[in-house]
Amino acid sequence: MSQPTFYEILSLSPTTSDLTPASIKQAYRRALLTHHPDKSSSNFSSSTSNSHSNSHPKGHHPPKTRYTIDQISLAYTTLSSPTLRTQYDAALRSSSSSSSSCFTTTRKEEDDDFQTGIDTIDLDDMVFVPHETSSSAGISRNEKDTWYRPCRCGNERGFALTEEDLEENADLGEVLVQCADCTIWLRVCYVVAEDDEEEEEEKEENGDGDGYEEEKRKR
């Protein structure tokens, strides 16, 4: 049985010339939720769960072929990189699907310029730098809380995430980030704590209501 291509994994057409980083990222997110629907239901609030239920309407059947998270992540990191995608497309054109499988399984044997390995860590494994410290240090992304991790290419802050990055991918509970200096990617997993804002708002509303009733009694 031939191995699926990265395009098949993300349900993208290799002949589409107008694939953008945004459309590839959207396909990646869609693939994760399609093949691993638990990604959107295990960690998040009811509002996110509602959006997930809308993306999987009643009567929806799971895919016949289920891809692993590693397959989906590797497909995304390869196709979202112009250099790697060009090399991958060349491999698809010049060989059979079995050769594209070789591309997938032997990528670690290629030179460093073609490395697409993906390490998986928890957010707690990254160094947290509050925005106040970042601002005083003059870091470019200085107005946001930032998480850093060194890359094995030598860059001490090769991987960088902001709170905005985490919020953007909150429905997945993970985010893929590429090293600033090489093609190595990192998958960072995290759990989104349930927001207590609604409860606080309810308490405030109840408090306002009690105050209103008390004011009426005084009158």
UniProtKB/Swiss-Prot annotation:
One of its GO terms (molecular function) is metal ion binding. The keyword Cytoplasm applies. Pfam families: DnaJ, Zn_ribbon_CSL. InterPro entries: DnaJ_domain, DPH3/4-like, DPH_MB_dom, DPH_MB_sf, J_dom_sf. One of its GO terms (cellular component) is nucleus. Keywords: Cytoplasm, Iron, Metal-binding, Nucleus, Zinc. Belongs to the DPH4 family. The DPH-type metal-binding (MB) domain can bind either zinc or iron ions. This is Diphthamide biosynthesis protein 4. The lineage of its organism: Eukaryota, Fungi, Dikarya, Ascomycota, Pezizomycotina.
